A protein has these predicted regions:
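Residue(s) in the substrate-gating loop at a strand-loop-helix junction
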Residues: 15
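Hydrophobic structural elements of the Rossmann-like NAD(P)H-binding subdomain
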Residues: 11, 53-56, 102, 107
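Active-site-adjacent segment of SDR/Rossmann-fold oxidoreductases
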Residues: 1-4, 20, 36, 41-51, ...
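A glycine/serine/threonine-rich, flexible loop-to-helix segment
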Residues: 48, 55-81, 120
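Active-site helix of classical SDR
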Residues: 31
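Active-site "substrate specificity/gating" loop of NAD(P)-dependent dehydrogenases
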Residues: 21-25
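C-terminal helical subdomain
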Residues: 75-155
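Conserved catalytic-site region of short-chain dehydrogenase/reductase
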Residues: 18-20, 62
Length: 155
């Protein structure tokens, strides 16, 4: 239907647990980071049809966050800074006509930020590279001081 109408907005729910990691939440984090991969692919596939696909990475008092060991969250009476409604401005924007394409927005407690994948220029060791070659340049491979936003592989 979106292809036929040449318009659409898709918003997936990711999580800080997937993007940054969270102790004891490997399975959940892996699934939520998978949403970012799905978004990256669909944002490319739908772009020519004005279909924008994005991710929201929310933080709020929910039944799931209340179930984390040591949590003192009361989902029936969340404190003002943890209320789920505080992510609403971001979701409304991502579902709007003005929505970007292929972006991740964090929303928690009235604070908003953007996450993205950054890469450095890389190191070309040639097709006969050895482990020793790699180890000799590993500092350059790991150096993110001049990293740039990546939207395509090796570009």
């Amino acid at each position: 239907i979106m292809y036929e109408k040449n318009y659409g907005r898709v918003v997936f729910t990711s999580s800080v647990s997937g993007i940054l990691g969270s102790f004891g939440q490997a399975n959940y984090g892996a699934a939520k980071m998978g949403m970012v991969g799905l978004m990256n692919n669909l944002s490319r596939e739908g772009a020519s049809h004005n279909i924008h696909t994005n991710c929201l990475s929310p933080g709020a008092a929910t039944r799931m966050t209340a179930s984390v060991p040591g949590s003192s969250i009361d989902v029936d009476n969340p404190d003002e800074g943890n209320h789920p409604g505080l992510v609403s401005p971001a979701i409304l924007y991502l579902a709007s006509e003005d929505a970007p394409n292929g972006r991740i927005i964090q929303a928690a407690g009235g604070r908003f930020a953007s996450d993205a994948v950054y890469s450095n220029a890389g190191v070309d060791l040639g097709s006969d590279a050895t482990e020793e070659d790699f180890l000799g340049r590993v500092d350059d491979v790991l150096d993110l001081s001049e990293a740039e936003l990546k939207t395509q592989f090796w570009k």
